[in-house]
């Protein structure tokens, strides 16, 4: 059977209603995406301090509807637009999606990711490319971050070059747990991951067990107390600025702080939020993103 995807770019205020109308009118599935995802203009909406979900779509939203081969995209889009009171049907494109062995197709699209000198993120259906590699077994779709984003790569490269054996380490905003897991594999001591999303905490625990790593993951209120030799936070600039005093307080005197999720144009503002406690500088930049690091004065 041949399927088709109908792709529409719509205004934020219309995205949710239009997606519901498309589904009610016979679309097999409908999703709403940020049309600017993976660009410097992407918008954070959910699951971040300072970005409460007061709106349910992005400024430039992309609605993707999966249609069966018997559906008429023009009629469906027109009917959906009429159902929600739009004066005109939005422009759309249609692309064919052949029926496939989706498991095999997905696996073919995810190869091992090489990061730094010796770190590899390897899907479970692949073997490690190097016997001496630091290997993280992590499947796409089971996690909130698999090492492909520039900010994750920057943090992992920093860890590979700077981790000291036995350091007490905190990964704040741990997502999939990837940074905490690689830090532990590189030799840190007690290693803790914290996230405000319970699903991320569960994903991190699963990934740590799968990688045979002893690391603790929890919600912020359940996190261990005290300071850390190393604190890593790969989030986004606004929550990083809001959490500056809290994160600085978690770093022991003489300890180090590493931040990413920051665009190059945002680096100065983020560093300014931390300047009174920890002077930060750009360690490395990639694809418009930066990794900031600094040492807390003793």
UniProtKB/Swiss-Prot annotation:
UniProt keyword Cell inner membrane, yes or no: no
Reaction catalyzed: L-lysyl-[protein] + 3 S-adenosyl-L-methionine = N(6),N(6),N(6)-trimethyl-L-lysyl-[protein] + 3 S-adenosyl-L-homocysteine + 3 H(+)
CDD domains: AdoMet_MTases
Key word Cell division present: no
Taxonomic superkingdom: Bacteria
InterPro entries xref list: Ribosomal_L11_MeTrfase_PrmA (IPR050078), Ribosomal_PrmA_MeTrfase (IPR004498), SAM-dependent_MTases_sf (IPR029063)
GO molecular function: protein-lysine N-methyltransferase activity
Keywords, alphabetical: Cytoplasm, Methyltransferase, S-adenosyl-L-methionine, Transferase
Gene Ontology CC annotations of this record: cytosol
Gene Ontology biological process terms, A to Z: methylation
Binding site for S-adenosyl-L-methionine: 152, 173, 195, 234
Primary localization class, coarse: cytoplasm
Known EC number: 2.1.1.-
Compartments where located: Cytoplasm
Its job: Methylates ribosomal protein L11.
Homology family: Belongs to the methyltransferase superfamily. PrmA family.
Stored HAMAP family: Methyltr_PrmA (MF_00735)
Record-given protein name: Ribosomal protein L11 methyltransferase
Organism field: Ralstonia nicotianae (strain ATCC BAA-1114 / GMI1000)
Lineage: Bacteria, Pseudomonadati, Pseudomonadota, Betaproteobacteria, Burkholderiales
């Amino acid at each position: 059977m041949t399927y088709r995807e109908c792709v529409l770019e719509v205004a934020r205020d219309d995205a949710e209603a239009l997606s519901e109308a498309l589904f009610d009118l016979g679309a097999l599935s409908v999703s709403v995406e940020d049309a600017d995802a993976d660009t410097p203009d992407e918008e954070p909406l959910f699951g971040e301090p300072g970005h409460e979900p007061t709106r349910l779509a992005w400024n430039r939203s992309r609605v993707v509807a999966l249609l069966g081969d018997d559906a008429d995209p023009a009629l469906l889009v027109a009917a959906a637009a009429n159902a929600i009171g739009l004066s005109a049907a939005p422009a759309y494109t249609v692309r064919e999606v052949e029926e496939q062995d989706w498991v095999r197709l997905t696996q073919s699209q995810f190869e091992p990711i090489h990061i730094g000198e010796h770190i590899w993120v390897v899907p479970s259906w692949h073997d490690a490319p190097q016997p001496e590699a630091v290997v993280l077994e992590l499947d796409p779709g089971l996690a909130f971050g698999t090492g492909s984003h520039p900010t994750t790569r920057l943090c992992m490269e920093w860890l590979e070059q700077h981790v000291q054996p036995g350091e007490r380490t905190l990964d704040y905003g741990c997502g999939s747990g990837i940074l905490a897991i690689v830090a532990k594999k590189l030799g840190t001591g007690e290693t803790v991951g914290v996230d405000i999303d319970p699903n991320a905490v569960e994903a991190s625990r699963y990934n740590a067990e799968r990688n045979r790593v002893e690391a603790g993951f929890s919600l912020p209120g359940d996190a261990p107390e005290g300071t850390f030799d190393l604190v890593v936070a790969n989030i986004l600039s606004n929550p990083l600025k809001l959490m500056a005093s809290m994160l600085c307080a978690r770093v022991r005197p003489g300890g180090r702080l590493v931040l990413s999720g920051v665009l190059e144009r945002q680096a100065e503002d983020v560093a300014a939020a931390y300047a009174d406690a920890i002077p930060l500088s750009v360690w490395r930049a990639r694809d418009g993103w930066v990794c900031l690091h600094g040492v807390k004065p003793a």
